[in-house]
Each structure stands twice: as C-alpha cells, then as structure tokens.
C-alpha cells in the first residue's frame, strides 16, 4: 500500500502552517478511512492547533486602553462653576479716577475761603467754581476733603486732658483760648450761681480792692493837707482871701477815720471854696477892677486927711 509514503508529505504542510501569522490551514490528505495513521499523528500533537498566535500592535493597543464600562468617568465641570468663571471674565476692571490738579492760585483762594467759611451753600459753591474755572463737583469734593483733614488734625493734636469738661464740650476750643480762660469758668460748668458767687466774693482781689480804697483815702487826705499848706503860703492882698482859708479849715476839722459819706461832703465843700477863690482872683485881676480900686483910694485920701 502507498499509505506510509503519504504521511511524511503531510508533516511539512503542518510545519509551514505554524510559521505563518494566520491560523493553521487544514491539511487535506484524503479521507480518514484511508489514513488511519494520520489520526494518531493529529492526536499526538494537539498543542500545535491550540497555540495562540503572537499579539499584533493593534491588539496591544486595544488591551492597554481601559474599557469604557469598567473605567471611571472623568469629572466634568458643573454649571455653577461654569457660571462663576463666566462672571469673573465679565467683571470689568474699575478705572481709577483722575485726580484734579489745582494750581497755586486756586489753592490760595480755596484755603482763604475755607478759613473764613467751612460750609458753603449751593449758590456759593457755584459762584466759587465759576471764579476758579472749576466744576461744582470739584469744589465740593475739595471742601469735603479739607474738612476731614482738619478734623483729623484736631483729633491728633488735641491735648489728652483728663478733664471731662473739655472732652464733653460741643464746640471745639483751641489750646490758646483754653489756656487764657479763667480757671473759675471750668470749676462749675453747669453755671450754678452759688458757686460762682462764692468764688468771686472769696477771691483775694476783693481784699486787695479794699486795701486800695484805704490807700486812696489816705492819699486824698495827704493831698488835701498839701493843698491847704500851699494856699496858706500864698499871699493874697484881696479881702476875699480869707474865704478859702475858712472853707479849708472847716474841711480840716474832719478826722481821717471818718466814714466815706463825710469824706465826700468835705471834698465837695473844699471844691466849692476853691471855685469861689478862683472867681474872685479872676475878677480882681482884670484892669477895670484895678482902676476902680485906684480911683477909690485917691478919692478917699483927701477926706481922711
């Protein structure tokens, strides 16, 4: 039979099929009934048919890529986050306002007006803005800033006194006015009259005034005695010279310890006496009276002889 030589021819076919990349091709050697030895050879080598082929590059990529069903899904941004990002993009950047640059002449006029009047009406601000060639808003803003600066300066430079009167005062007083104020004004801020009256009456200046009155009275008495001496020293050739002396002597009868009413009466009497003397001397000093006296004396001499 020619069965044995046919079998060796089938082996190279199997070896050739294993070397290919594709699956092994079936070997057709004829019907199984005619080749009983072929069945045994196929049974002896079952591993050749079950060997898996080498994985290709496409197979590796498919295996490495995760399965969509098993792999976790990537977190997508929510609607709130998207809206927040959109708002941030839409928010415009605030532009800084350009500061107004005032000239030296404008600042001089503004400072002068601020020293005289810190609060201006609408009409006054409009007039001032027209004079300085500025807008109403610029003048208003400058006055507001200047008022804030002055308040801040007063707050920082204000003397930190523990006295509650200065802290509770509604109207601010500057340190120069505060120092010149009398201390008694701060003792009783409510303005009660008893305390004020006690302070004024118990003041040492009242006793000083009484001493000054006594010294003035002594001075007046000394002046009166000096006047009497001067009047006595003068020689008067008129018969009216005794009038002043008598009035002054009557004034000298009062003692220095007499009350003030007697002193005033004495001074008035002395003044009247002096006025009479002055009038008589003026009358006698005129040339008419001198001529009259001379004529009278000449007419009287022959009769006396």
From Swiss-Prot:
Listed GO biological process terms: stem cell population maintenance
Gene3D superfamilies: Homeodomain-like (1.10.10.60)
Subcellular localization, as worded in the UniProt entry: Nucleus
Residue ranges of the region described as Sufficient for strong transactivation activity: 241-305
Spans of repeat Sequence: 196-200, 201-205, 206-210, 216-220, 221-225, 226-230, 231-235, 236-240
Keywords associated with the record: Activator, Developmental protein, DNA-binding, Homeobox, Nucleus, Repeat, Repressor, Transcription, Transcription regulation
Stretches for region Sufficient for transactivation activity: 196-240
Example of a GO cellular component annotation carried by this entry: nucleus
Chief place where the protein resides: nucleus
Compositional bias segments (type: Polar residues): 65-83
Region (Required for DNA-binding): 122-151
One MF annotation (Gene Ontology) recorded for this entry: DNA-binding transcription factor activity
Region span, Disordered: 1-95
Entry keyword Coiled coil: no
Family matches, as InterPro entries: Distal-less_Homeobox_TF, HD, Homeobox_CS, Homeodomain-like_sf
Pfam families reported in the protein's UniProt record: Homeodomain
Annotated region (8 X repeats starting with a Trp in each unit), positions in chain: 196-240
Chain's role: Transcription regulator involved in inner cell mass and embryonic stem (ES) cells proliferation and self-renewal. Imposes pluripotency on ES cells and prevents their differentiation towards extraembryonic endoderm and trophectoderm lineages. Blocks bone morphogenetic protein-induced mesoderm differentiation of ES cells by physically interacting with SMAD1 and interfering with the recruitment of coactivators to the active SMAD transcriptional complexes. Acts as a transcriptional activator or repressor.
Protein family per UniProt: Belongs to the Nanog homeobox family.
PANTHER family xrefs: HOMEOBOX PROTEIN, HOMEOBOX PROTEIN NANOG-RELATED
UniProt subunit comment: Interacts with SMAD1. Interacts with SALL4. Interacts with ZNF281/ZFP281. Interacts with PCGF1. Interacts with ESRRB; reciprocally modulates their transcriptional activities. Interacts with NSD2.
Name of the protein in its database record: Homeobox protein NANOG
Gene: NANOG
């Amino acid at each position: 039979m020619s069965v044995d030589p046919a079998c060796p021819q089938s082996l190279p076919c199997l070896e050739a099929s294993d070397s290919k990349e594709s699956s092994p091709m079936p070997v057709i050697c004829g019907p199984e009934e005619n080749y009983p030895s072929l069945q045994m050879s196929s049974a002896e080598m079952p591993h050749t048919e079950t060997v898996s082929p080498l994985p290709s590059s496409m197979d590796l990529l498919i295996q490495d890529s995760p399965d969509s069903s098993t792999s976790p899904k990537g977190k997508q941004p929510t609607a709130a986050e998207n809206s927040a990002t959109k708002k941030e993009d839409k928010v415009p950047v605030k532009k800084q306002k350009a500061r107004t640059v005032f000239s030296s002449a404008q600042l001089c006029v503004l400072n002068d007006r601020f020293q005289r009047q810190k609060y201006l009406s609408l009409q006054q601000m409009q007039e001032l803005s027209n004079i300085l060639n500025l807008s109403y808003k610029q003048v208003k803003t400058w006055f507001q800033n200047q008022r804030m600066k002055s308040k801040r300066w007063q707050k920082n430079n204000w003397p930190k006194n523990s006295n509650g009167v200065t802290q509770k005062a509604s109207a601010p007083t500057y340190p120069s006015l505060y120092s010149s104020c009398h201390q008694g004004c701060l003792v009783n801020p409510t303005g009660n009259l008893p305390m004020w009256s006690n302070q004024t009456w118990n003041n040492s200046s009242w006793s000083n005034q009484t001493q000054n009155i006594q010294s003035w009275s002594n001075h007046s008495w000394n002046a009166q005695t000096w006047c009497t001496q001067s009047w006595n020293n003068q020689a008067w050739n008129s018969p009216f010279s005794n009038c002043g002396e008598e009035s002054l002597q009557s004034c000298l009868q009062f003692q220095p310890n007499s009350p003030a009413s007697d002193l005033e009466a004495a001074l008035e009497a002395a003044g009247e006496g002096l006025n009479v003397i002055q009038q008589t001397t003026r009358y006698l000093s005129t040339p008419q009276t001198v001529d009259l006296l001379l004529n009278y004396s000449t007419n009287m001499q022959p009769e006396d002889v």
